[in-house]
Each structure stands twice: as structure tokens, then as C-alpha cells.
Swiss-Prot record:
Signal peptide: none annotated. The chain crosses the membrane at residues 7-23, 112-132, 280-300, 333-353. Pathway: Carotenoid biosynthesis; staphyloxanthin biosynthesis; staphyloxanthin from farnesyl diphosphate: step 4/5. This is 4,4'-diaponeurosporenoate glycosyltransferase. Its main location: membrane. It comes from Staphylococcus haemolyticus (strain JCSC1435). It is an enzyme of class 2 (transferase). Disulfide bonds: none annotated. GO terms for molecular function: glycosyltransferase activity. It is a multi-pass membrane protein. Its EC number is 2.4.1.-. Belongs to the glycosyltransferase 2 family. CrtQ subfamily.
Length: 375
């Protein structure tokens, strides 16, 4: 075995160890039949929606099929389609998001959520993105049971399981994995005293804590509302927890097209990375290096007699198996797409560079026809 081959194997081996350490802890929702109906808390689900006539019906239908009844509020954020009409037809309460004419710069999802909270007196508030879907009749019960374990206090957030249908949607695989790993909660090496980050698609809290922390008002000038919420609850010494949605909560992201997907990940990727603990970021980088070394070793072995093709193929296979295993925790991605991990890695790097440019230099990102300034 040559020095080059030894170096490639060692590098890939280090990547495998890093991949294990960065995501060797899991927090999954669970449903206990014996505890069904145990809660006496009133619950409201608040859904910020802008031009969501295609995706909103799936969420509202899944909410109507739950084993527990909840109030459903849809905040229509200046939609120009049938979002409001469809929501009313499906039994939701609909309110318009109104903006004053005094130079109000607080717009978008966080503002819609903040207004939505003012329309309910329920004990527990659940904010859900319009692209979320509950996967079975006990999903909401599982969410509430999990929240009950923290005595119905603080903030609980959920990253839905990503389902995909079109080929380009599989390119979101690494972004979803990094979203989970980057919150600093899913590794045994995470520092417990670090910043409390939260996922944005589904957040759960009680009304009194929301008022105490001022809720989404903390995200008035931030592009990732989940991070702002987590930090606000942490400042008030309230618990902040994060869960994976697999088995109970899912979403389909960016079904509108490839361009929308790029815009969506661009608007917050670099911001999210800046909040990841340094040693977790180091594990992520070392793991990503495996994409390069395992593929390069395999490719070079086809042309260089000094490299064993069998050993390089084994190294590539081991890395790819771990790559598939980690990604299937966060989404229903094609094994074929995951097997060509070097392409997914290239897309991730290009979008990350573009995100970094927007967030640190242009200070502007575009999303759903709106231009957002980044402070």
C-alpha cells in the first residue's frame, strides 16, 4: 500500500469517525397510548401562510384527522391566490396580516406568527409552516406528550421529516442534515452551556412563556426565527428542546421548483452555520472531507496502478453507507442520489458560498417575491 493510498484511507476513516460523533444522539417524538387524552390544556395551531393554496390543504386535512381537537388559525400574509378562501372552507379561522404605513420594516413569517398569537387565548401555542403535514392521527398527541415531559414550559421545536418527489428535491439532502446537526444538540460532544437554537417549521410553547419572552418579536430583524426564539427563551431561563419529526411530522420543501429551493437555502444557510459550535463545525468539515477523499480515491484507482481499486471501492462504500444512513434519518431521499454524494456535496458548497456572499456582503436575500435586509 502506497503512502497516497494510506493517506486517502486514513482521511476517509477520520471522516467516518467524525460522521458518527456529529450525529450519535437522537431525540424522537413518541406516542404513549396509555397517556392519550391526558392533557387538559387548550391548544391553538397558528399557520403563517403566503400564497399557500397548494400546500395548505394537506396540513389542514391532517389536523382535522387528529385524535385531539385544536383551534386552527391561518394568518394570510398578503396572498394573491386562494389561500384564505381554502382555509375558511376547511374550517380554519383566517386573519389578514396587516402592515401599518409608518415605515414598518418587520414583515414576513415572524410578524405573521406574532399577530396570530394575539388572536388566541389557548394555553398552548403551536406554530406550523404551511408545508408541514402530520403523518398519522396521533401525531399531535405525540407532540403534546413530548411537551408535557418538560412540564408544558419553555420552547419545543421539531424538524419535520423531509419527503421528496421530484429529482431536484433530492439536492436538499445535505442541507437538511446540516440543519439538524448544526443545532448542536445531536452529538454527545455538544456543550450544554452553548446557545439554545431551535428549528423553525414547528414550534411549541405555552402562552404565558410566549408573552414573557415576547415570542417572535425577537425575530423582527432576523432571518431565522427559530434561532431568535431559542435564544429568547434561554435568556429567560426556560427549557429549549429539539426533536426530529420522523414518523409523526413531515414536510415537502420547495416543490415550486429548483430556483425556489436555491433561494430558500440561500436565505439562511450561512447564518445557521455561524451559530454552530466550533468543535461541532470541525466534525462537520472533517466528515465532508470524506466526500472528496473517498470519491477521489475511487476515481484515481481507475488510472493509477499504485492504488488498489478494491480497497478504494471498499473505502468509498463504507463512507457512502454512512452517508445514506445519516440522511435517511432526516428525509426520504433516494439511495441512488445519496450514492453519488460528491454531486450533493458540490451543490451544498456552491449554495453555501452564495449564501455567505448575500449575508455578509450584499446584506440582501430574496424570498417569495420579497427582498429581506439582513442586519
Amino acid at each position: 500500500m502506497t503512502k497516497l493510498e494510506s493517506l486517502l484511507h486514513a482521511s476517509t476513516g477520520l471522516s467516518l469517525i467524525s460522521g458518527y460523533l456529529m450525529y450519535n444522539r437522537r431525540y424522537l417524538l413518541s406516542f404513549d397510548k396509555k397517556r392519550e387524552g391526558e392533557t387538559t390544556q387548550s391548544i391553538s395551531v397558528i399557520i403563517p401562510a403566503r400564497n399557500e393554496e397548494k400546500r395548505l390543504p394537506k396540513l389542514l386535512k391532517s389536523l382535522s384527522q387528529q385524535s385531539m381537537r385544536v383551534e386552527c388559525i391561518v394568518m394570510d400574509d398578503d396572498s394573491n391566490d386562494r389561500t384564505a378562501e381554502i382555509a375558511r372552507e376547511m374550517g380554519a379561522k383566517v386573519y389578514n396580516v396587516t402592515y401599518d404605513n409608518n415605515g414598518n420594516t418587520w414583515i414576513g413569517k415572524s410578524y405573521a406568527c406574532y399577530l396570530g398569537a394575539s388572536y388566541t387565548v389557548s394555553d398552548i401555542l403551536i406554530f406550523m409552516d404551511a408545508d408541514v403535514e402530520l403523518n398519522n392521527e396521533h401525531a399531535l398527541e405525540a407532540i403534546i406528550q413530548s411537551y408535557a415531559r418538560q412540564q408544558y414550559r419553555g420552547l419545543m421545536s421539531i424538524q419535520p421529516y423531509h419527503v421528496v418527489y421530484k429529482p431536484y428535491e433530492h439536492l436538499s439532502a445535505m442541507f437538511n442534515l446540516m440543519t439538524v446537526v448544526g443545532t448542536n444538540s445531536f452529538s454527545t460532544l455538544s456543550k450544554s452551556k452553548g446557545e439554545s437554537l431551535a428549528f423553525g417549521p414547528v414550534t411549541v410553547m405555552n402562552k404565558s412563556d410566549y408573552i414573557l419572552t415576547q415570542g417572535h418579536k425577537n425575530a423582527a430583524s432576523h432571518i431565522i426565527e427559530g434561532f431568535s426564539l431559542g435564544k429568547a427563551f434561554q435568556r429567560c431561563q426556560l427549557p429549549v428542546t429539539r426533536f426530529e419529526g420522523q414518523g409523526f411530522v413531515s414536510f415537502r420543501m420547495y416543490e415550486a421548483g429548483f430556483k425556489t429551493m436555491i433561494e430558500g437555502w440561500t436565505k439562511h444557510l450561512a447564518v445557521g452555520a455561524s451559530s454552530t459550535q466550533p468543535h461541532i463545525m470541525m466534525l462537520i468539515i472533517l466528515w465532508m472531507v470524506g466526500c472528496i477523499t473517498s470519491f477521489s480515491g475511487l476515481a484515481l484507482s481507475l488510472f493509477m496502478k499504485t492504488l488498489s481499486f478494491k480497497r478504494m471501492a471498499l473505502s468509498y462504500s463504507l463512507y457512502t453507507l454512512q452517508f445514506i444512513r445519516l440522511h435517511r434519518r432526516v428525509g426520504r431521499f433516494s439511495i441512488l442520489f445519496l450514492a453519488i454524494n460528491s454531486i450533493l456535496f458540490l451543490v451544498f458548497i456552491l449554495v453555501y458560498i452564495n449564501s455567505y456572499r448575500h449575508i455578509h456582503y450584499t446584506k440582501q436575500v430574496k424570498w417569495k417575491g420579497r427582498q429581506f435586509s439582513i442586519k
